[in-house]
């Protein structure tokens, strides 16, 4: 007995297009039913079991197989060029079946193929491999005649009409035979060179060169390394005891030793001829007090009009108090954070200056006593000699500079907050 068929490798795949306008992508693959069908035919007809002779050809690393089947003393050769033994035997069995179907029963010992029912089986196997529906047979019977039955088979959406027969079974076999011959005839003239056979040798799949995907150049990314470079530069310069980054130092003050980003205004000290000592605080403007002989004291106010009076009291936060003691020439002004004191002669009017952004000047006569400033304390007292007036200047944000004539004393202004003045 013949061994059960096994699937064929991909080399035996049929490359012929599907018949009857089927999709070109559908192929009849692994058609290994022909040996079993030929074995069945031999058993029903009483013939000997088919004998297969397979030959190996070609080099050992790429062998090619060819097979020959012998049935009823007739040999049928397979198509050449198969890459395995089983595929060659299947091809030989197919060739034998096709030749038997085409033959006419000339000898009584060999009955007709259509009588064995092989055509219906082949057509059904073909439909299964092509993923078609099972072939359907429709038979009609005429009123009279020697062959009243005519059968039509439908496969793949196409109907095939068989020849007339005496019985319904014979009519179905003839219809299946007609369908097989039509399918084989349509596959003969295929453009890809395929033959009328289903099992055909395939092309050996060579080792294709591995195609590496084309690498598309990626756009270069902008490196954000500016800060890193500056940081490294600063670190290196700090280690060597040098200055920090030059670019950042442009926005800084050269004397800023703490690497602060806050801009500091340089301290400016000005001094004029014939003037006393001048002291200025940073971040504020200088205020000057000049003394002239017999002039009254002037008051400069950027936002208000000038005011002249014998005695004027300014109270920015609290009330001003004036006290006088008879036998003292020293005047002391003690604001919360700033105090300004000055000595004046009698018969000089007192004026109070309160500019916020501009410099104020106080003119005094010579022979002015010493003024003392004491910051960061509570309100002070002004002590003057008899018949002398007091001069008080209060600034919130600007420095005050005291300028005097040759006989003048030293005035040290320390501006910050409001001052309280006491006059008697």
From Swiss-Prot:
InterPro entries per the UniProt record, alphabetical: dsRBD_dom
Ranges of residues in domain DRBM: 33-102, 118-185
BP-aspect Gene Ontology terms: regulation of gene expression; RNA processing
Feature: compositional bias, Pro residues: 1-10
Pfam families: dsrm (PF00035)
Chain ranges passing through the membrane: none
Region feature Disordered, mapped onto this chain: 1-22, 287-330
Bias (Basic and acidic residues) ranges: 287-308, 318-328
Keyword terms of this UniProt record: Repeat, RNA-binding
GO molecular function: double-stranded RNA binding; ribonuclease III activity
GO cellular component labels: nucleus
PANTHER family: DOUBLE-STRANDED RNA-BINDING PROTEIN 1 (PTHR11207:SF1), RIBONUCLEASE III (PTHR11207)
Purpose: Binds double-stranded RNA.
This protein's name: Double-stranded RNA-binding protein 8
Organism: Oryza sativa subsp. japonica (Rice)
């Amino acid at each position: 007995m013949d061994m059960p068929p096994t699937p064929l490798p991909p080399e035996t795949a049929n490359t012929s297009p599907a018949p009857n306008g089927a999709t070109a992508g559908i192929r009849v693959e692994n058609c290994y039913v022909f040996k079993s069908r030929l074995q069945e035919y031999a058993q029903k007809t009483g013939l000997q079991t088919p004998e297969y002779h397979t030959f190996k050809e070609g080099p050992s690393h790429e062998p090619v197989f060819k097979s020959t089947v012998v049935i009823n003393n007739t040999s049928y050769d397979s198509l050449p060029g198969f890459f395995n033994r089983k595929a060659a035997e299947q091809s030989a069995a197919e060739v034998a079946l096709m030749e038997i179907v085409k033959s006419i029963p000339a000898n009584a010992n060999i009955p007709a193929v259509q009588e064995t029912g092989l055509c219906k089986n082949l057509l059904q196997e073909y439909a299964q491999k092509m993923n078609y529906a099972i072939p359907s047979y429709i038979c009609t019977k005429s009123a009279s005649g020697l062959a009243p039955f005519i059968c039509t088979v439908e496969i793949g959406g196409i109907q095939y009409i068989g020849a007339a027969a005496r019985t319904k079974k014979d009519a179905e076999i003839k219809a299946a035979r007609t369908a097989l011959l039509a399918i084989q005839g349509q596959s003969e003239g295929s453009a890809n060179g395929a033959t009328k056979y289903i099992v055909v040798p395939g092309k050996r799949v060579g080792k294709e060169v591995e195609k590496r995907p084309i690498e598309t150049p990626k756009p270069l990314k902008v490196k954000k390394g500016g800060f890193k470079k500056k940081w490294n530069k600063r670190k290196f310069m700090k280690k060597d005891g040098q200055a920090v980054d030059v670019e950042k130092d442009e926005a800084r003050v050269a004397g800023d030793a703490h690497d602060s980003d806050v801009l500091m205004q340089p301290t400016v000290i000005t001094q004029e001829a014939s003037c006393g000592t001048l002291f200025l605080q940073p971040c504020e403007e200088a205020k000057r007090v000049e003394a002239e002989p017999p002039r009254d004291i002037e008051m400069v106010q950027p936002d208000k009009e000038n005011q002249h009076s014998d005695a004027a009291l300014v109270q920015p936060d609290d009330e001003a108090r004036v006290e006088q003691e008879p036998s003292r020439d020293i005047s002391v002004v003690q604001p919360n954070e700033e105090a300004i004191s000055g000595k004046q002669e009698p018969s000089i009017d007192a004026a109070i200056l309160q500019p916020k952004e501009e410099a104020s000047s106080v003119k005094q006569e010579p022979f002015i006593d010493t003024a003392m400033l004491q910051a960061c304390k509570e309100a002070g007292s002004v002590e003057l000699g008899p018949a002398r007036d007091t001069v008080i200047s209060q600034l919130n944000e600007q420095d005050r500079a005291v300028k005097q004539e040759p006989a003048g004393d030293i005035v040290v202004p320390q501006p910050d907050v409001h001052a309280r003045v006491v006059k008697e």
